[in-house]
Amino acid sequence: MTWRHHVRLLFTVSLALQIINLGNSYQREKHNGGREEVTKVATQKHRQSPLNWTSSHFGEVTGSAEGWGPEEPLPYSWAFGEGASARPRCCRNGGTCVLGSFCVCPAHFTGRYCEHDQRRSECGALEHGAWTLRACHLCRCIFGALHCLPLQTPDRCDPKDFLASHAHGPSAGGAPSLLLLLPCALLHRLLRPDAPAHPRSLVPSVLQRERRPCGRPGLGHRL
């Protein structure tokens, strides 16, 4: 075997190895590209699924909520399944239930469930949240209904007495001012030129009790 045969053999082996290497790299690139495409498709589907559910089922949820009657239960409970106890309709008087959590009330109706009719108000000219005095009770207007506190003046039923009781309340604030005046008066007595030397003599004489006999009136007892 001549040297030419050896060269041809080496050339053939190297060419075969290069072809095998190119084939393996092509297979790896193809496999990685397929995995990336699958991942992208799965990600796009995952992102689109909540949006599709929201757009397609929002009308169904709101429409089914509008169709419930005042005495009809919900078809099923979202939290506990079919075996849970049914709850009544969330909105009244033609209100629209949005996502099962709050109501959009029509005109002249208010409240959490549109249960209060503003045209049938017990408050008269009072607005929502206003206070008034009615039959010796302090009342507040809440959604067209009066809610009264217990009786404020048990023995008197005159609004003037009720107002007077509140007017005399702040007078108790004058007690601290009187307590501040007492040290000032004592200090003034001490600074006077004719002030006594002993502090016990500062006590007014009106506070000293006189000694009197404890016997019956008309009978004189000597001390």
Swiss-Prot record:
It comes from the Eukaryota. Its main location: secreted. The keyword Disulfide bond applies. Keywords: Developmental protein, Disulfide bond, EGF-like domain, Gastrulation, Glycoprotein, Secreted, Signal. It is found in: Secreted. It holds the Pfam family CFC. Residues 1-25 form the signal peptide. One of its GO terms (biological process) is heart development. One of its GO terms (molecular function) is activin receptor binding. This is Cryptic family protein 1B. It comes from Homo sapiens. The lineage of its organism: Eukaryota, Metazoa, Chordata, Craniata, Vertebrata. The gene is CFC1B.
